[in-house]
Amino acid sequence: MANHDPISDMLTRIRNASEKRHQTTRVPASRMSRSIAKVLQQEGFISEISEEGEGVLTHLVLELKYSGKHRHPTIRSMQRVSKPGLRIYKNTRALPKVLGGLGMAIISTSKGVMSDRDARKQGVGGEVLCYVY
């Protein structure tokens, strides 16, 4: 079956693995998924990114982070905002603050994929891909 929204697929795989306390999860590799994974790593939601396979069958292996004695997931929720049927764009001043700054939004800008904080610092807006907290 064809996957019409690879970003939603990636977020769902990460969310499901996190809820089940899996150490790693695999997502199909693409430029967008690599960029999103890099932002999640920079913001401290995942610990390591590696690639597996080659060509069309390349997958990213994401090592998830947990905290505390009971291994609480660092990622509590991931929500897709802009969808293929309804794109959501925001300028610099309208970029959302997720949970009053405790979470983050991942933004696709003309300067690449970045967190909402980085987009504000650089003074760029763009497509709001998802919220993570």
Curated annotation (Swiss-Prot):
UniProt KW keywords: Ribonucleoprotein, Ribosomal protein, RNA-binding, rRNA-binding
Superkingdom of origin organism: Bacteria
Gene Ontology annotations for the cellular component aspect, listed alphabetically: ribonucleoprotein complex; ribosome
UniProt-listed SUPFAM superfamilies: Ribosomal protein S8
Complexes and interactors: Part of the 30S ribosomal subunit. Contacts proteins S5 and S12.
UniProt cross-references to NCBIfam families, sorted A to Z: PRK00136.1 (NF001109)
Full protein name: Small ribosomal subunit protein uS8
Species this protein is from: Prochlorococcus marinus (strain MIT 9303)
UniProt gene name: rpsH
